[in-house]
Amino acid sequence: MSLFDLFRGFFGFSGPRSHRDPFFGGMTRDEDEDDEEEEEEGVTWGRGNSRFEGPQSPEEFSFGFSFSPGGGMRFHDNFGFDDLVRDFNNIFSEMGAWTLPSRPPELPGPESETPGERRQEGQTLRDSMLKYPDSHQPKIFGGGLESDARSESSKPAPDWGPQRPFHRFDDTWPVTPHSRAREDNDLDTQVSQEGLGPVLQPQPKSYFKSVSVTKITKPDGTVEERRTVVDSEGRKETTVTHQEAGSSPRDGPESPTPPSLDDSSSILDLFLGRWFRSR
């Protein structure tokens, strides 16, 4: 397989293939043939040589030069660069018809303003700047309506079939991107009618609770337990419990005493007490 066939097959092109192999033809020659050429004597090396007479095989290296009687040198450039340049021109000309837009974008100038484009009496600046179809009249760009420009831009790409350039990359590079509706929305009216709930996206909330327990044993044996709870909203609640030596704990004046979760009996009573009471 020649370089041209490999290049065309990789990019998905088909067509007439050159039977010459100018790049790899010189690599397939034997060293014996090179030695024979060095031993040959003559003024002309190229088309005047016997090697270039008659039909040449694709493996022949078709580049030579000869000396004219006036002392000049003439090159016979049959290396295949003309075919290479012609193939590249054909490839990139086909690519241009597929990728380039139909016409370059034009920006309206101050002189292209028409009476239909001017803002109507009583029409607000916001309404005049809304994109079509939210506004009542389509915009005019460069002397043509926006609907005409959209119809031209929405024309399908030429059907290349299986021989389209780079058709093997369709999974990675989609030819026609998915169209999205880009329209202006009147959020003021929507908020006044429905409120901010449907407009604003719901934000996820996190619920957590931070618990800090501090125990202080006084010299007389009294144990003071301070329990501070901070929730996700930032609310803080502090519970103080006093327990005298050899007596049950009693609550402080700040808040009622919650069940203690320090020992295993309190944990079992908390989780299983209600279930046994309901039986």
UniProtKB/Swiss-Prot annotation:
- BP GO annotations: negative regulation of apoptotic process; regulation of actin filament polymerization
Primary location: mitochondrion
Region Involved in PKD2 binding: start and end of each range? 184-279
Instruction: Give the bilayer topology.
Output: Peripheral membrane protein
Intracellular or extracellular location(s): Mitochondrion matrix; Endoplasmic reticulum; Nucleus membrane; Cytoplasmic vesicle
Q: Which InterPro entries match?
A: HAX-1 (IPR017248)
GO CC terms: actin cytoskeleton; apical plasma membrane; cell cortex; clathrin-coated vesicle; mitochondrial matrix; mitochondrion; nuclear membrane; P-body
Which intervals carry biased composition (Low complexity)? 57-67
Subunit and interaction comment: Interacts with ABCB1, ABCB4 and ABCB11. Directly associates with HCLS1/HS1, through binding to its N-terminal region. Interacts with CTTN. Interacts with PKD2. Interacts with GNA13. Interacts with CASP9. Interacts with ITGB6. Interacts with PLN and ATP2A2; these interactions are inhibited by calcium. Interacts with GRB7. Interacts (via C-terminus) with XIAP/BIRC4 (via BIR 2 domain and BIR 3 domain) and this interaction blocks ubiquitination of XIAP/BIRC4. Interacts with TPC2. Interacts with KCNC3. Interacts with XPO1. Interacts with RNF217.
Entry protein name: HCLS1-associated protein X-1
The gene coding this protein: HAX1
